[in-house]
Amino acid sequence: MSRRGTAEEKTAKSDPIYRNRLVNMLVNRILKHGKKSLAYQIIYRAVKKIQQKTETNPLSVLRQAIRGVTPDIAVKARRVGGSTHQVPIEIGSTQGKALAIRWLLVASRKRPGRNMAFKLSSELVDAAKGSGDAIRKKEETHRMAEANRAFAHFR
C-alpha cells in the first residue's frame, strides 16, 4: 500500500473581468513565457471581436464552442504482447475541457490572419457554429475510437 496521499484536485480560478473559469483556463493555456498580461489582452480582444461578429453574449459563444469541441472518448496507446494498440477510453469533463481548449488554440494558431485575437475569435465562432479545425479534430478522435472499438477490453 502506498504511503503517499492522493493529490487534491485544484479548482480553476475565475478571471478578474468576466468572473468565468473557462476564460481563465483559456488564458493559462495561451500563456507563453510567463506573459500573463499579454495573454489576458489577447483573450479580451478576442471576446470583443466575438461580440462584434455575432452580436450575442460572447461568453455563451465561448461556452458553446468549448462544449462542441469537448470529446467524450479518446484513444490511448497501450502495449499488449509486443504490439501497440490504440485503446478507446472515456474522458472526464475536466480533461475533456482541457483537450477542447488545447485543440481550439492549436487550430487558431494555424489559421491565417492578422493577430492571435482575430484568429482565436474566428475559430471560436466557427466552433460554436459546428465547423472549423477544432471540430474536425474532435470528429477525427471519435472516428479513431470507433475504429478501435475492438480493443476496448484492454483498458
From Swiss-Prot:
GO molecular function, one term: rRNA binding
Keywords (A to Z) from UniProt: Chloroplast, Plastid, Ribonucleoprotein, Ribosomal protein, RNA-binding, rRNA-binding
Keyword Chloroplast: yes
Subcellular location, record wording: Plastid, Chloroplast
Cellular component terms per the entry's GO annotation: chloroplast; small ribosomal subunit
GO BP annotation list: translation
InterPro entries in UniProt: Ribosomal_uS7, Ribosomal_uS7_bac/org-type, Ribosomal_uS7_CS, Ribosomal_uS7_dom, Ribosomal_uS7_dom_sf
Family as reported in the entry's similarity comment: Belongs to the universal ribosomal protein uS7 family.
Role this protein plays: One of the primary rRNA binding proteins, it binds directly to 16S rRNA where it nucleates assembly of the head domain of the 30S subunit.
Subunit details: Part of the 30S ribosomal subunit.
Name of protein: Small ribosomal subunit protein uS7c
Organism: Asparagus officinalis
Upper classification of the organism: Eukaryota, Viridiplantae, Streptophyta, Embryophyta, Tracheophyta
Gene that this polypeptide is encoded by: rps7
